[in-house]
Amino acid sequence: MNNKTLLLTGASGYLGQHLAVRAAEKFELYSAFGANPSGITAGQPVQLDLGARAAVHQTVDRLRPQAIIHAAAINPGSGDAVAMQRINADGSRYLAEAAVAVGARLVFVSTDVVHSGLTPPYTDNAPPTPINDYGRSKAAGEAAVAEIDPTAAIVRTSLIYGLEKMDRGTDSFVKRLESGQTLILFNDVIRNPVWVESLAEALLKLAELDFAGILNVVGRQALSREAFGRRLLAYWGIDTNNKVQAGHAADISATIPLDLRLTCTKAEQLLQMTLYGVDDVLAMNGSKNLNT
């Protein structure tokens, strides 16, 4: 029987689904969701409105978890600036308050988008320079967590992908291709994609460590969105029918950070693990053809 208790927010999301399965092996797990519990893969489902301060405090006080991994967020495309502020900034503040009140270890999942993309590569302690609503809301969440709970771990990560279940980004690419649209992938947007299994392992390790502060947890290989997208489409065996073209984000919007390369040597040393790049992960896992 697991004696340690863990509250996982965002448990019905892509990262949360992978985290929950792993976490349930080590913890008595409470899997928090906002509105729809259908994506919960493990743990005891708990409905939680992160934007309601009283509800957050009451839920955490009732469950009294020893650790909290805060993976819930409103991402671009799933909510506007108001929703992002409510959940990503205010909700993170409320959760940090509640964690301190019950003495819970807090691990907050943040993003590389807190940076502008103008001065890469970004070290773990590089100050935020957000240029869009999502980045500003997550930077505000970071600041609140650091102020309220200086012992918390703040994890900046990047594009998350998996090879058992198609990630949200690749799935959207496939839907566009299937509808006959031409898919434009940016070759001037650079990221360090992270394998969901690596990220989940890192977060669970941090839940049991006393590291405090900001830690970059990303794959060690930097790729353009075009190169990354083409690799994953090939892995899943998707016939692109020459419908994939390179594009330039800089020509479209001034609020898309271009080069968000992050360093990850500190995380690899602290967590004693290799944060594999995309090519290494694909080589270890072969390919999956959905057309057969």
Q: Where are the predicted features?
A:
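Short alpha-helix in the Rossmann-fold core of NAD(P)-dependent oxidoreductases
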Residues: 87-92, 137-138
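Glycine-rich Rossmann NAD(P)(H)-binding loop
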Residues: 185-190, 215-223, 270
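NAD(P)-dependent short-chain dehydrogenase/reductase
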Residues: 143-191, 198
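Conserved Rossmann-fold NAD(P)-dependent oxidoreductase catalytic core, especially the SDR/UDP-sugar
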Residues: 93-131
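Mid/C-terminal beta-alpha module of Rossmann-like enzyme folds, strongest
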Residues: 202-205, 209-258
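N-terminal Rossmann NAD(P)H-binding glycine-rich loop of SDR-like oxidoreductase domains
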Residues: 3-26
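Conserved C-terminal active-site "lid" loop/helix of NAD(P)H-dependent oxidoreductases
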Residues: 224-230, 246-292
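NAD(P)H-binding glycine-rich loop region in Rossmannoid oxidoreductase-like domains
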Residues: 47-88
